[in-house]
């Protein structure tokens, strides 16, 4: 039997794209290909691209160029792949280009240029949970593709299509495999998590689905309840502020899913929100936040905002700062508006000069850092559950229920030598200090 061919792989972009990469890698390994992390020795290189903002497009184009220069045989997939002409204009020598979540097309192209190897069908090449690019103790779980919203700053629907929710049975089966394989934290992702199954209402009304021998509804609340029964932390990301999101908060208060809500609000000026085609009642949002915290006092709220959107006046920006001050959000990300080819907002009048975007960005972050520092300071003296992400000679680094990997803060544990711990273990840590982003504590 000849040795298996090597496939190099580059994964760019968000966690949703990372899930696509994991799916492709699992398919490759199932077909007997070796996966390597270098260009040298690869029979072909796959680049899974991002195309959300111009800087991501540039990074993707540079990665394609690097792969071509160092290997020469390159297949491109992912969000930027939806703009084939843009890629061909700069890199005409790319072998094949597909759009996002085009798993079958990618595999077809791989087989064309690097024939499927022979291997023993009695040898399992893939773990039951599939190939994962995250540490063994946490994993991303994608519950749908695409989005039905048409936010004017975004081109995701043009690349990934309209909302297409996965079957609740398939999602729960995947989640159970992950937990059985040792995953301690499931991070639920999609373009629009709170829209899950809304596209399947008619279909779901006419049939009954079963999981573990019991009939279940195919909706977001049921999905969260069942995920919460598996024994792992369940964290929700990218939750659009629909009214039915209110129904998730009691599940968090009961401990069925983590008391953590990643809800991108984008702005606080009614005028700007209308121009963005986003929900515009900030007063209602503040009322909901107050109610959520009454129901679930330990709730962590994360959000993202855009400053420098076309037409944003100083008055609009001040409304955003006022909202931050009143809402007292726990975790906040801020982006300076970036024109994206194909986005409606790119062609709007009253584009904001870069120096004003920069100045507003710094004012925004300066205020939020003060808010974050105070909210974290309030945790000093409390004993919190912490999941361990890193262990080395200097100490332990972990995260509380309030911290998602990569985007939120961490907990540095000082006296770790007192007990034996391992990656993915959830331990109790007493918080002793805090800054604007991170915590320090002792076992």
Swiss-Prot record:
Entry's Gene Ontology BP terms: tRNA modification
Cofactor note: Binds 2 [4Fe-4S] clusters. One cluster is coordinated with 3 cysteines and an exchangeable S-adenosyl-L-methionine.
GO CC list: cytosol
Residues binding [4Fe-4S] cluster 1, per UniProt: 14, 50, 79
Taxonomic superkingdom: Bacteria
Names of required cofactors: [4Fe-4S] cluster
Alphabetized SUPFAM superfamilies for the sequence: Radical SAM enzymes
UniProt entry keywords in alphabetical sequence: 4Fe-4S, Cytoplasm, Iron, Iron-sulfur, Metal-binding, S-adenosyl-L-methionine, Transferase
Compartments in which it is found: Cytoplasm
UniProt domain Radical SAM core: residue ranges: 133-374
Catalysed transformations (reactions): L-aspartate(89)-[ribosomal protein uS12]-hydrogen + (sulfur carrier)-SH + AH2 + 2 S-adenosyl-L-methionine = 3-methylsulfanyl-L-aspartate(89)-[ribosomal protein uS12]-hydrogen + (sulfur carrier)-H + 5'-deoxyadenosine + L-methionine + A + S-adenosyl-L-homocysteine + 2 H(+)
Gene Ontology MF terms: 4 iron, 4 sulfur cluster binding; aspartic acid methylthiotransferase activity; metal ion binding; protein methylthiotransferase activity
Database matches in InterPro entries: Elp3/MiaA/NifB-like_rSAM, Methylthiotransferase, Methylthiotransferase_CS, Methylthiotransferase_N, Methylthiotransferase_N_sf, NA-bd_OB-fold, Ribosomal_uS12_MeSTrfase_RimO, rSAM
Residues in TRAM domain copies: 377-443
Coiled-coil region list: none
Segments forming domain MTTase N-terminal: 5-115
Binding site for [4Fe-4S] cluster 2: 147, 151, 154
Enzyme superclass (EC): transferase
PROSITE patterns the record matches: MTTASE_N (PS51449), MTTASE_RADICAL (PS01278), RADICAL_SAM (PS51918), TRAM (PS50926)
Assigned EC number: 2.8.4.4
Function of the molecule: Catalyzes the methylthiolation of an aspartic acid residue of ribosomal protein uS12.
PANTHER family associated with the record: RIBOSOMAL PROTEIN S12 METHYLTHIOTRANSFERASE RIMO, RIBOSOMAL PROTEIN US12 METHYLTHIOTRANSFERASE RIMO
Family: Belongs to the methylthiotransferase family. RimO subfamily.
The protein, known as: Ribosomal protein uS12 methylthiotransferase RimO
Gene (name only): rimO
